[in-house]
Design a protein with these regions (language model features):
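N-terminal beta-strand motif that seeds the catalytic metal site of vicinal oxygen chelate
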Residues: 1-15, 29, 72-77
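Core segments of cupin and vicinal oxygen chelate
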Residues: 9-52
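A short, acidic/glycine-rich surface segment
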Residues: 29-31, 54, 59-64
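Vicinal oxygen chelate
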Residues: 31, 43, 89-127
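A generic structural micro-feature
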Residues: 36, 46, 67-69, 105
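Exposed loop/turn and edge beta-strand positions of beta-sandwich/beta-sheet ligand-binding modules
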Residues: 38, 71, 109
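Mid-chain, well-packed structural core segment of small domains
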Residues: 68-89
């Protein structure tokens, strides 16, 4: 068994698509748009076959995105090396994304950094 995909709602679906394509190498399918409900989605496929569905609907409401809450906490991307973690973190910082933890080795031995995407979702970048 494997997880087929993870889905998340976003406010700006095109900006979210561009973010994952530019920084994480995702490939996006064509935009799906249900004109009856105004639901929109992209499936983003990553190099290892993992998929993320980003979705939008006009009547969505904001959720308080504190660092700790019940439910999903973050999405983690393995980029292959410490150097790539460092380089991507610098690129994201220069592009204006908030770095919530600089590259470091955690107590359980992971080398990672954490950033917030354009909508405040936590993204972990690891080896």
């Amino acid at each position: 068994m494997r997880i087929e995909h993870v889905a998340m709602y976003v406010n700006d679906i095109d900006a979210a698509k561009d973010f994952f394509v530019q920084y994480f190498g995702a490939e996006a399918n064509n935009l799906y748009h249900n004109k009856k409900t105004d639901f929109k989605s992209y499936f983003l496929t990553f190099s290892d076959g993992a998929r993320l569905e980003i979705m939008n609907k006009p009547q969505m409401c904001e959720r308080n995105k504190e660092n700790i809450y019940m439910g999903y906490a973050h999405i983690a991307f393995s980029v292959g090396s410490k150097e790539k973690v460092d380089t991507l973190t610098v690129s994201l910082k220069q592009a204006g994304y908030k770095i919530i933890s600089q590259p470091r080795t955690t107590g359980d031995g992971y080398y990672e950094s954490c950033i917030l995407d354009m909508e405040g979702n936590q993204i972990e970048i690891t080896i």
